[in-house]
Amino acid sequence: MQNAFTIDQLPLSWQEQLKTEWSQPYMHKLREFLQSEYSQTTVFPAKDNIFTALKSTPFDSVRVVILGQDPYPGEGQAHGLSFSVPQGVRLPPSLINIFRELQTDLGIENTTGCLQSWADQGVLLLNTVLTVRAGTPFSHAGQGWEQFTDAIVTKLIENRSHVIFVLWGNAARKKCDLLFHSSHKHAILTAPHPSPLAAHRGFFGCSHFSKINYLLKKLNKPMINWKLP
């Protein structure tokens, strides 16, 4: 576990922003917890994929943040990017709804669930909790990940400008309470969660994908190509 959970796993830009977190007491406890969990039970994602979101989207490249909750708990689903699944894996219900809204909004139809190309374009696909015990949603909540991802969000709020934060659901909104005091620096898009339980309460019809590209165009930044390869 040790090699997979060191700061040198991250791009240099994230190392610079998060280096003080690695020495915090909560991180020491989190490392011990993860070492125990990975050695005694099945945990997702694989150790090498825990920090895929940060590896894929360096700090200075972040243009959009889409916050998730915790990884998918099913075999072969989680690979370190929120809402995403590896190539060839059946689409989970929330991702089906995300793609449904994308098609309604921009006429783009995606059939593969791997969102890596979004991450490569500057969309940080970050879960609030980065690991989960197999078959048990939220099983790694309250172990320290929330503090770590709070630090990620805080660094973006404080040290970057004109980032578009996409908050789907109450958990994401609560996570970004700080944003509502710094909205002059950043853009905020909110909607209900895309899960089947909530999507009909306002996620469908939110038009977030076109709104993101409209905001990027206003900032003279390249728009996101939402069509997956």
Curated annotation (Swiss-Prot):
GO terms for biological process: base-excision repair, AP site formation via deaminated base removal. SMART domains: UDG, UreE_C. Keywords: Cytoplasm, DNA damage, DNA repair, Hydrolase. It comes from the Bacteria. It holds the Pfam family UDG. It is found in: Cytoplasm. GO terms for cellular component: cytoplasm. The active site is at D70 (proton acceptor). It catalyses: Hydrolyzes single-stranded DNA or mismatched double-stranded DNA and polynucleotides, releasing free uracil. InterPro entries: UDG_fam1, Ura-DNA_Glyclase_AS, Uracil-DNA_glycosylase-like, Uracil-DNA_glycosylase-like_sf. GO terms for molecular function: uracil DNA N-glycosylase activity. Its EC number is 3.2.2.27. Belongs to the uracil-DNA glycosylase (UDG) superfamily. UNG family. NCBIfam families: PRK05254.1-1, PRK05254.1-2, PRK05254.1-4, PRK05254.1-5, ung. Excises uracil residues from the DNA which can arise as a result of misincorporation of dUMP residues by DNA polymerase or due to deamination of cytosine. This is Uracil-DNA glycosylase. The gene is ung.
